[in-house]
Structure formats: C-alpha cells, structure tokens
C-alpha cells in the first residue's frame, strides 16, 4: 500500500475543536448522554467526525472535551483539551450565550476586532460554535437558552509560548480558525505545493500569478480579477520567498499580491517567511506610515506602542485615512520587494479588510499594463 507523504496530513483548529466539544455537550443535554464522537460542521462547510472524551451530564449541564489534533503542523496548541460546558438558561429562551473559561485568553486592548474584557474567541469560531450548538439543540431552544463556556485546561501555560502577551491577550490562548482546518504550512510538502502551483501556471502559458496568504484573501482577489483563469491564483501561505523565487525561475512577468494588514506589514518590513510565530509586526513601521499620511502625533504614538497591525488599521479608519494608509503600505511592500527582486517582474498589491472588503490597490508606476481597470495580461488556456 502506498504511504501518504509525510507532512501532508491536515489537522483542526482550536475553533473547530471547540465547536465539536460544544456540539457534543449540547447533544448530551438533549439526549441525556454525551456521545463518544460527534459530527461537526466546520466554517468551510465540511463535516468532520471528532472523538469526544470525558463526556458527562449532570442535571441541567453537560461537559465534553475534544483533544486538538494539529495534523502534520503541530503548534503549541496541539493535544490541547478544548472543553465545553453547556448549561440550560431557563430565563433566556432561544439564546446561545458564549463565554470563555479557564485557559481562554481575555482581550485587554483594542485592535483585535473583539470586545475588550471579553474572551479571545475570534468571530468565525464564535459563529461556528453557535451554529453547531443551535443545530444540535433543535427544539430545546424553544424551551430554554444555553450558556456555552469554552475552556482549555493548561491554556495559560500554553499561551506563554505564543505572542498573545504582545497582543494584549492575557490568561490563556486564543480560539482561532477561519476554515476549521490546519494546513501544514511549515512543512516541505506545503512549500512544494506552492512551487508546483506556480510552475503549473507558467507551463500553461500564463504570465501572471496572483499570490495570496490564505482563503479569504484568495476569494477577495478572485472577485477582483474575474478575467484570470483559476490556475493563476496560488495560496502561498507564509512562504513568500519560495513563491517569488519560483516566479523568477519560471520567468513570469507579472505578480499580484493579495493580503491584509498583518502579512503585508511583515512583507514591508522585509520578512520572507511571514508566519505569526517568527517575528512580531513592526508597529514602528506602521506608525511611520500613519504619520506619512497625516495622522496626528498622538495616534502615531498609540500605534507605535501597540503590538497589533489591526489596531493601526482601525485608527486610520476612524480618522478617514484608511485608503491613504493602505496605499502607503502597499508602496512600502513594493519598495521592499523591488530591492530583493530588481526588475524581475511587475508588482501590484491588492489589500482587503478582515471581511474581504477591498481597501486599496497600488502598482509600480512603470507597469501601466497591469492596471486592474483594464484586463490583466493573460496567456493561452
């Protein structure tokens, strides 16, 4: 039997595991017994069966644990016990109230898109947890509401090995995941897939490649560039260097990069591998850009003292400087990449917010043929 290549097995996010635990505990309230396994719908629509441990029901509460399997890209949360305690709320019929418990971080600063003082459970996992709980609860929600408490025993210790403290998240880890799937981004297998995808585009006669950092940015640029065939779009993940080195080797003439503020800042500051755990975002750079586009000195100081790229974006939006800020950031990205890859390809940067809404686009002044108001160059299909 042919073995599966090492480094290709995907895993599941803390958000997906939390949703599965919450669903299992909710089923425990409905049926009187927590199941040993549960089928859970991920944010990407995929349905996956998770093993459930330590399931129990005690009166109007139920408890379930899903142990995280990060696949072939184990991070610090691999094997963490994502735990859900679900309790009836007789006075809140139809409500699903989500809370953070032991080992889930608390937000202490603005800039993460989450309420200060609330749990570090990101928006997509929040919606996914609630959707799974509602689906499992069924008619139960016609008689009562449900309180869902997500906890991670040992999460405070795990968080010490993350960048949460720099982001103002204290007391535990974050519950994350936009698709529910952990891809092995740090493996040779994923790097090889990025290289291969660019080679395929070149071999099919394309002279444009559109590089994105993930699923949301890829959907964004696909909507912006509907004239391009799917082969032109490549999710490079964190592997900018491998992607652009392959572009040069294959002789592709045009590169479009789609991204959000965090990854783009890392590219602008010269990072070639943009994984969150490698180096922090340079907020001094963001403060300089904010000053460049006219932000007051006190705002620039706040940005400089923050640890989050998103905070800078939010402050610029409040000031009505969001477009100018992103255009300046895009120019910094082009300048940095041009120093590393002089005259090898044209560059255009497309930028979106965290909901994949377009914020700005910039291109090199010497590449008018790549303006997005007109069709991009396209090779033979």
Curated annotation (Swiss-Prot):
Keyword Ribonucleoprotein assigned: no
InterPro entries per UniProt: CbiD, CbiD_sf
Protein name: Cobalt-precorrin-5B C(1)-methyltransferase
Keywords: Cobalamin biosynthesis, Methyltransferase, S-adenosyl-L-methionine, Transferase
Disulfide bonds: none
Enzyme type, top EC level: transferase
Pathway this chain belongs to: Cofactor biosynthesis; adenosylcobalamin biosynthesis; cob(II)yrinate a,c-diamide from sirohydrochlorin (anaerobic route): step 6/10
Family named by the database record: Belongs to the CbiD family.
Gene name of this polypeptide: cbiD
